[in-house]
């Protein structure tokens, strides 16, 4: 999302962390924006709408950005993430297709287990981040970013055609479902009231198809992008408003928008594609080496492996790091300097942390400046201020795992 102007500025939260092409006030939008199945629901609940990645989405509701953020950390919030691209990869060669595009080990995923992975190019750059789930229904369920919708879809469709021309059994289907994210420490408790399945048996990055508050055919995945426990629910369009309404009846739940989602993911040290990672960033530079499957590293059979794998054993020129500072908040594009005042890097995302009451950011610096505790300078509003390289996540994550 952009350093969005007027509408967002009046809300007291500047979406400077988001990529310029993605988010802006509706008054600035020239194209016809797409609407999620919950568009009227958002308006009825006081949603303040902005243009994001070609969609009209709520940046916040009646509560302040800070209140929404803290409510998610302490209770739970409901987010509409229906703008994200949901696809099914079908056929007996579905794993072969996906492993030809991503860095992760898809073949070793158990039924209904998922993983965060990366589309990469032959130069080692990251084309997008995505979640791939090996469903027990015999297909791969893929969720990727709205801002990369056309690029990701074309990438997968081209590979489908290539493999089909080789006689391979593979296909692709775009899902028309809505996608709701219920995030926060009480999310599972809230959802349990509406499902027969025991959510204690659904750990982080696993999923199951179930009826949720009377809506059948929902895929519930224990994941999210806030650092908290939570789920993402892929729901048939016809049941989306009913499901959101049913969840919102619980007093634990409040609606939250793009502003809270961005500050929550930043506190959790999670990347925003287009800002923190892009086609010119490798997984090693982006501190995402953990996404590289062990078998895939050894085989060097993913796009860009000849660039990426040697970086694991050697040194890269720069790394993504966390930063904390007092004073004015660091924003995307703020210059990072060493203590001698020489520019050495750039902030890619930044905001005041409602949880820590400090300013947090992430950015890229040369490896010799990447050790936690290293003191640096950040230029904010033409003034230099002290910043310290900090471990991420900035706040502890609370993902649910089986004991």
UniProtKB/Swiss-Prot annotation:
Catalytic activity: N(6)-[(R)-S(8)-aminomethyldihydrolipoyl]-L-lysyl-[protein] + (6S)-5,6,7,8-tetrahydrofolate = N(6)-[(R)-dihydrolipoyl]-L-lysyl-[protein] + (6R)-5,10-methylene-5,6,7,8-tetrahydrofolate + NH4(+)
Pfam families reported for this sequence: GCV_T, GCV_T_C
Feature: transit peptide: 1-28
Keywords: Aminotransferase, Disease variant, Mitochondrion, Transferase, Transit peptide
Subcellular location(s) of the protein: Mitochondrion
InterPro entries (alphabetical): GCS_T (IPR006223), GCST_C (IPR013977), GCV_T_N (IPR006222), GcvT/YgfZ/DmdA (IPR028896), GcvT/YgfZ_C (IPR029043), TrmE/GcvT_dom1 (IPR027266)
Binding-site residues, substrate: 232, 261, 399
Effect of residue 269 to D: In GCE2; decreased aminomethyltransferase activity
Molecular function GO labels: aminomethyltransferase activity; transaminase activity
Location, primary (coarse class): mitochondrion
EC number: 2.1.2.10
GO cellular component: glycine cleavage complex; mitochondrial matrix; mitochondrion; nucleoplasm
GO biological-process terms attached to the record: glycine catabolic process; glycine decarboxylation via glycine cleavage system
Associated pathology: Glycine encephalopathy 2: A form of glycine encephalopathy, a metabolic disorder characterized by a high concentration of glycine in the body fluids. Affected individuals typically have severe neurological symptoms, including seizure, lethargy, and muscular hypotonia soon after birth. Most of them die within the neonatal period. Atypical cases have later disease onset and less severely affected psychomotor development.
Function: The glycine cleavage system catalyzes the degradation of glycine.
Family under the similarity heading: Belongs to the GcvT family.
PANTHER family listed in its UniProt record: AMINOMETHYLTRANSFERASE, AMINOMETHYLTRANSFERASE, MITOCHONDRIAL
Subunit structure: The glycine cleavage system is composed of four proteins: P, T, L and H.
Cited NCBIfam families: gcvT, PRK00389.1
Name by which UniProt lists this protein: Aminomethyltransferase, mitochondrial
Native source organism of the sequence: Homo sapiens
């Amino acid at each position: 999302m952009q350093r969005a102007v007027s509408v967002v500025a009046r809300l007291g939260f500047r979406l400077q962390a988001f990529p310029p092409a993605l988010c802006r006030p509706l008054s600035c939008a020239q194209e016809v924006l797409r609407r999620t199945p919950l568009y009227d629901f958002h308006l009825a609940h006081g949603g303040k709408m902005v243009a994001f990645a070609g969609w009209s989405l709520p940046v916040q509701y009646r509560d302040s950005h800070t209140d929404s953020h803290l409510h998610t950390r302490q209770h739970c919030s409901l987010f509409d993430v229906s703008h994200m691209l949901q696809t099914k990869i079908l056929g007996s060669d579905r794993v072969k297709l996906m492993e030809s595009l991503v860095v992760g080990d898809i073949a070793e995923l158990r039924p209904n287990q998922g993983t965060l992975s990366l589309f990469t190019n032959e130069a080692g750059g990251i084309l997008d981040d995505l979640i791939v789930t090996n469903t027990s229904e015999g297909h791969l369920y893929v969720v990727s970013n709205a801002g990369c919708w056309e690029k990701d879809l074309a990438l997968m469709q081209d590979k489908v055609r290539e493999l089909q021309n080789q006689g391979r059994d593979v296909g692709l289907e775009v899902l028309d479902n809505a996608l709701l994210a219920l995030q926060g420490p009480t999310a599972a408790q809230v959802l349990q009231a509406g499902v027969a399945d025991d959510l204690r048996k659904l750990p982080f990055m696993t999923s199951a198809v179930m009826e949720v508050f009377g809506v059948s055919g929902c895929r519930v995945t224990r994941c999210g992008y806030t650092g908290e426990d939570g789920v993402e629910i892929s729901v048939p369009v016809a049941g989306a408003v009913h499901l959101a309404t049913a969840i919102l009846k619980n007093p634990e739940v409040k609606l939250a928008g793009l502003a809270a989602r961005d500050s929550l993911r930043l506190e959790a040290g999670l990347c925003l594609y287009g800002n923190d990672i892009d086609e010119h960033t490798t997984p090693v530079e982006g501190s995402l080496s953990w996404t590289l499957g062990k078998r895939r590293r050894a085989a060097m059979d993913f796009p860009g492996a000849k660039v990426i794998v040697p970086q694991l054993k050697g040194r890269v020129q720069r790394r993504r790091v966390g930063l904390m500072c007092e004073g004015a908040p660091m924003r995307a594009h703020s210059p990072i300097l060493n203590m001698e005042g020489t520019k050495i890097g750039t902030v890619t995302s930044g905001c005041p942390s409602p949880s820590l009451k400090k300013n947090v950011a992430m950015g890229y610096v040369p490896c010799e400046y990447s050790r936690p505790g290293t003191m640096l300078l950040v230029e904010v509003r033409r003034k230099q201020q002290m910043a310290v390289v900090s471990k991420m996540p900035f706040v502890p994550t609370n993902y649910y795992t089986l004991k």
